[in-house]
Amino acid sequence: MFKGDSVIIPRKTGTGAGDSSIEGPILTCANKGLRSERCRPRARGCLTSLMIVLCGILSLPCLASTTDDAAPSFRLPDGARPTRYSLDLTVDPRSPAFHGVATIEIELKRATRVIWLNQKSLTIRRVAVSKMGGSYRPAVWETREEFLMVRSPFAIGPGKVDLRVDYDAMLNDKSSVGAYRKKSGNDWYVYTSFTPIDARRAFPCFDEPGYKAPWAVTLHIKREDVAVANGPDASSTDEADGMKRVAFKETQPLASEVVAFAVGPFDIEDAGVAGEKRIPVRIITPRGRMADAAAARAATAELLPREEAYTGIAYPWDKLDHIAVLDLPFGATENPGLITYRDSDFLVSPAKDTPRRVAMLRKTMAHEMAHQWFGNLVTQAWWDDTWLSEGFATWMAAKVTNTDLPENAQGLAMVQARDQMMRLDAKGKRPVRLEMRTREQTDDVYDLVVYQKGAATLKMVEDWVGEGPFRVAIRRYLQEHAMGNATTAELERTIEEKTGVKVTPVMDGMLNRVGYPLIRFRLADAKLLVDQEPVGGGTPWVVPICIHLENAKRRCELLDTARVEIPVEGAQDDGPRHRHAWIWTNAYGSGYYRAVLDEEMLDEVLDRGYSELSEAERLSLLVDIKAVTQPDH
């Protein structure tokens, strides 16, 4: 804590000169400044200016405090941005720790002497700073919780500076976060799992999705081991003591959470090439498990071209490895060039496999490959917009695997997912977009709501504005933000520009509210009378209502008040029975609302319209009937 002109810092600190990590209280030699082992504590009340002069005379790395010294609470200050990373790591899966040197090129917005970045549980050995093209000079540093503060010995910025950090990190074998190791039989393996904020456990970095930069990775490993990473192998050179140096091609800009590497006695199989650029595809498994990956081999060549065709952009990365990972905490992770899958999901003996399991694997692979555009090529600017990654990948995976199904089953998966999501959403758990202000809140980043309600939002808007115009808008969105970041507002703006439909009120409601509307329909005098009841209360929803009317094309109307009347020509028959034409009020089956028809309308659509509905519309009718009549089932 801070007391007067002196600072008591019960944290790890160092000067950057030699192995100087220190635990325990350290007194600084400047007012609220960083400490140096060579600095001496002064009596309380001594003049700060005199101390700075003394430190300067003695050539000590002691600097006056600035507002840049204030520790971040969660989000990094915006004054520094990484433009390139170089990682040089020595990794032996048999050891519980590894050594690393991280060199980071940084662009500074303004003059400063302090740089903040992320670290967690790293043992910092040395830190040095260099102006571009100059020699490195030792810097003082301090670790505070999940941050590393570096104080330069000279003024830096605005402009570029290089930061080099020499450190050690743990390879945890008790959990599966950060860089960790697992044993299978007699073999040890190292894997990484960084999403959303655990890259900082493996190397110092700007561990936020808005900070994307190229990564050059070099691994020093035992000669009998294999190393893989995001980029293709660039070179492999034998070193002393039974080691070898494996360098990988520098990546395109990536967020830290999708940087990945793995080391161990892997089996690797060439799975051919895929996509417009005929990128190489490989399957990677623990030793002796390749036969259990049979179902995965053909999937990439079949699914990747479908995603390229929709996005209009060739697969953006230089290779595509699918690797089975021991005890991966997620089902799969979309690291560019090195997609990881939980081994129990990815590897199944052909003798025990089932068509259902294969279909689920293909959908998982389609989801992770969709992330190569939605999440990696274009990355959410902050975690409150994680749905731009997960919602899009869920929606895309359903789209590209739909043709794997028999015709009478196509489109049903999204309706089933919508129904399940609405049952959960009725409980008011959380909205799709949730502001992230603490580490604890990031535990909720990958909630099911983000995936399924995010995907349902996209499907509803797609059917409302039209599949063709929506596709044009999505392609434009990807082109505008390629290799960068995006926000929900930017997506909404692009959709509106390319479709001419004002989608923002609809999407904002879907993404920022919990619940959904229950909408009641009845016919009177060739008008469809519509009343909505927000489930969970609140103001009326703004939602498109798409109707399928007998002998007419499907059409959509915007419901933006509690009650509307929609003219429906031909809705009433003038024949002797005076029957209403049948109407189903959730055409396409994608509207995120419960449709409740009055008795006469329901009888008509069940008796005369059911056979004319699409499979998705039939299912949406049935699930809405069940949800309203059996709400607890």
What are these regions (language model features)?
Residues E105, R164-D270, A293, E435, ...:
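Extended, low-hydrophobicity, Ser/Thr/Pro/Gly-biased non-transmembrane segments
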Residues K3, E146, F248, K277-G537:
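Hydrophobic alpha-helical and helix-loop surface patches within well-folded domains
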Residues T218-I221, K244, R287, A370, ...:
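Non-catalytic accessory/interaction domains
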Residues S121-S184, D241-G242, I566-R577:
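A surface-exposed beta-strand-loop module
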Residues L54, L58, C62-H99, G185-W188, ...:
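N-terminal, polar/Ser/Thr-rich
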Residues F98-K120:
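Ligand-binding face of N-terminal immunoglobulin V-set domains in extracellular IgSF glycoproteins
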Residues V114, Y136-G157, S193, I197-R200, ...:
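Aromatic/His-enriched, Gly/Pro-containing loop or helix-boundary segments
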